[in-house]
Amino acid sequence: MSKVKSITRESWILSTFPEWGSWLNEEIEQEQVAPGTFAMWWLGCTGIWLKSEGGTNVCVDFWCGTGKQSHGNPLMKAGHQMQRMAGVKKLQPNLRTTPFVLDPFAIRQIDAVLATHDHNDHIDVNVAAAVMQNCADDVPFIGPKTCVDLWIGWGVPKERCIVVKPGDVVKVKDIEIHALDAFDRTALITLPAEQKAAGVLPDGMDERAVNYLFKTPGGTLYHSGDSHYSNYYAKHGNEHQIDVALGSYGENPRGITDKMTSADILRMAEALNTKVVIPFHHDIWSNFQADPQEIRVLWEMKKDRLKYGFKPFIWQVGGKFTWPLDKDNFEYHYPRGFDDCFTIEPDLPFKSFL
């Protein structure tokens, strides 16, 4: 059979997806985290892989799904949180713009799976399935009640799940995980389609969403999930020593307030007393596309006058950040390669060819 006749849509997908294959899985496994540091990789959206100096591996909000894929239904799902927020009817054009950089089914070494809340782009059934099928049978699934309800509904045993609420602390090897208050107001209007929000006091945030502070021997990481700006970031900054903070950033469409702005990101960093602030989430949705350089420009305008004690860092999906080695860097660039140039003799027609 000729090659063009044997190739199918399915074979094409299997040969190209996930786009990075197991490249990043292998990189993470091979990484030896030096004492006094921690390493983390951006998996897209608010997905983070954190690795400590003791070799402890945890992932947070690792999501392997997609956004809109068809114009088939021109209307938004009835009762969707964005419909409640802005009174819209049209389909939200939120296409996923980020490649899949980590293969969940190539994960072998992991010590905990965490989620900040139960929105579809922060918790994933494929990740749960891969960990259940391929990893140690004592890996815990940690999150607020709504997340645990989802995991159990997918088939994760109840005894493998740990429900956390603000104030709880979970120890995973050499990483101490503190569950903190979340400020994700969108989560409060994520309700069953038939349930009305108008005129009804929302139920508590604690069962729906949490922020996390990861205390490793080499430093601390604050993960804010989908939280909006809140004055309570200052309380967290008073109560905890924070080295690196991650904040959900995006260009909110007209009539929508769902992501922090550049000014919010700077306010969050100042309130938390962090050393480094890193925006995330702006990468994933086509209709929330934002330029993180705006954060740096605004920081440059304000840093001397307001005596900022932090720096912004502009990351790339799939890239690594190591604390404190990268604390004075402003931007990430993927490894450029060719560091071994001229270790063998070039094969050119003549020296001045290039």
From Swiss-Prot:
- Going by the record, the broad EC class of this enzyme is hydrolase
What pathway does the UniProt record associate with this protein? Answer: Cofactor degradation; L-ascorbate degradation; D-xylulose 5-phosphate from L-ascorbate: step 1/4
Write down the EC number. 3.1.1.-
Q: What does this protein do?
A: Probably catalyzes the hydrolysis of L-ascorbate-6-P into 3-keto-L-gulonate-6-P. Is essential for L-ascorbate utilization under anaerobic conditions.
Where in or outside the cell it occurs: the entry states: Cytoplasm
User: What one GO molecular function would you report for this record?
Assistant: manganese ion binding
Q: Which UniProt keywords apply?
A: Cytoplasm, Hydrolase
Organism of this sequence: Escherichia fergusonii (strain ATCC 35469 / DSM 13698 / CCUG 18766 / IAM 14443 / JCM 21226 / LMG 7866 / NBRC 102419 / NCTC 12128 / CDC 0568-73)
Instruction: Please provide the Gene Ontology terms (biological process) for this protein.
Output: L-ascorbic acid catabolic process
Q: Which GO terms describe its cellular component?
A: cytoplasm
Q: Which family does it belong to?
A: Belongs to the UlaG family.
Report the induction information: Induced by L-ascorbate. Repressed by UlaR.
Xref: NCBIfam families: PRK11709.1 (NF008688)
Question: By what name is this protein known?
Answer: Probable L-ascorbate-6-phosphate lactonase UlaG
Cofactors: a divalent metal cation
Query: According to its UniProt record, which reaction does this protein catalyse?
Result: L-ascorbate 6-phosphate + H2O = 3-dehydro-L-gulonate 6-phosphate
Enumerate the InterPro entries for this protein.
Answer: L-ascorbate_6P_UlaG, Metallo-B-lactamas, RibonucZ/Hydroxyglut_hydro, UlaG-like_MBL-fold, UPF0173_UPF0282_UlaG_hydrolase
Pfam family, any one? Lactamase_B_2
